[in-house]
Amino acid sequence: MRKTKRITTALVGIVSLAVLASSCRSLVLEDRTPCPAFVRVEAVPPINPKTWERLGISVWEDGVEKDRHTVAVYELNRGYYIEAKKNSYFEASLLGGWPEEWMESDYLHIPEGNECPEGVGAYFGMEIGTDEIYYAPLELTYLYTNVVLRARGASAGYDFKMTVDGVVDGFQYPGSGLHYGPFHAEAREVEYLRREVRIPRQVPFKEITRADVVQETDALAALKADIFVKNEALGSFTHYLAIPLGKIISDSGYDWSRAQLEEIVVDLEMFEESIMSATVTIAGWTVILQGDEGITI
């Protein structure tokens, strides 16, 4: 009787070990790679919901766009989860204030003759491994800077205008690389003797590569502003001053890393219908240019 009981106990022990071994084997061999990862996209610092209620978001995996939709700002402020494939490269772009008709599949475009929209954007790229949760902080960045033209000492009733030309006409999408093409815009009248025009960032705000630096130097070199004054006798505009805007910006040590770029101010000193000088002020740094003789166009 004791012998039988010992045999039974031994059999139970063997069976239990077999079940445990089988269970352990299934745990060890379980493949969790098909399970997706999740990326928590969060606006850092938080976005003011009074300024933006919703933003467009584009998600890319291994260079291929996976999804594009809009998301409420309050969700981005508290953390917005996006499914991502494991062992892939994840990219997310936020965008607001850009006309839909100016958006191509892989870049944002400013049609020639238009100023830059009051757009904002953010970008984040990261490798997704085998973990299940990742964190992507996104800082909303302004995609433009403002150029202001002011005139002093002008004759009553005279008119003037400013145009800005460059070779950056938008941004790569996703990401923050520059898109190169002809940019031409005329400053709009804000008030009497004051004109303003928005120009696109001339330097990307994230992940600047060596190739970008070379192109950025060329882009800044090409950025210029031209000022015209109306000749009342002829009834046409006379070109009075060419401003090497890009060179002045470059020499000033302008901080392109700021989320919101500082505006560039051009002050004209006038005498009757002639420009005596122009003072360009950038973040407290000034350059004074003498007025040209004037060429009627």
Regions found by a protein language model. Name each.
Residues 257, 264-297:
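Eukaryotic extended interaction platforms
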